[in-house]
């Protein structure tokens, strides 16, 4: 009863379109979208340095080469086979 119904919103929308026209409303919509996009980009730029700091504060791990492990494992198995044969 006290709220705005869908019919009242439709009447307001028709009046706004008649007053401003579709071209003006389209321009306002694109300007509003561009400003929101710029705002989100500015907020996102502030968050990126914080994320970079988080990744740089992680523990340092040595990089391991898988091929070295395989060659070491193969050499160890061949040495153990040689010992068994002796």
Swiss-Prot record:
The keyword Zinc does not apply. Keywords: Cell inner membrane, Cell membrane, Membrane, Protein transport, Translocation, Transmembrane, Transmembrane helix, Transport. GO terms for cellular component: TAT protein transport complex. Residues 47-58, 68-77 have a biased composition (Polar residues). InterPro entries: TatA/B/E (IPR003369), TatA/E (IPR006312). It is a single-pass membrane protein. GO terms for molecular function: protein transmembrane transporter activity. The chain crosses the membrane at residues 1-21. It is found in: Cell inner membrane. GO terms for biological process: protein transport by the Tat complex. Residues 42-86 are annotated as: Disordered. The Tat system comprises two distinct complexes: a TatABC complex, containing multiple copies of TatA, TatB and TatC subunits, and a separate TatA complex, containing only TatA subunits. Substrates initially bind to the TatABC complex, which probably triggers association of the separate TatA complex to form the active translocon. Part of the twin-arginine translocation (Tat) system that transports large folded proteins containing a characteristic twin-arginine motif in their signal peptide across membranes. TatA could form the protein-conducting channel of the Tat system. HAMAP family: TatA_E. Belongs to the TatA/E family. NCBIfam families: PRK01614.1 (NF002448), tatAE (TIGR01411). This is Sec-independent protein translocase protein TatA. It comes from Photorhabdus laumondii subsp. laumondii (strain DSM 15139 / CIP 105565 / TT01). The lineage of its organism: Bacteria, Pseudomonadati, Pseudomonadota, Gammaproteobacteria, Enterobacterales.
């Amino acid at each position: 009863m006290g709220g705005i119904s869908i019919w009242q919103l439709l009447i307001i929308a028709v009046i706004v379109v008649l007053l401003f026209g579709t071209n003006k409303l389209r321009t306002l919509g694109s300007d509003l979208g561009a400003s929101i996009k710029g705002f989100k980009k500015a907020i996102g730029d502030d968050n990126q340095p914080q994320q970079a700091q988080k990744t740089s504060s992680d523990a340092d791990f040595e990089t391991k080469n898988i091929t070295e492990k395989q060659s070491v494992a193969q050499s160890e198995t061949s040495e153990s086979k040689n010992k068994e044969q002796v």
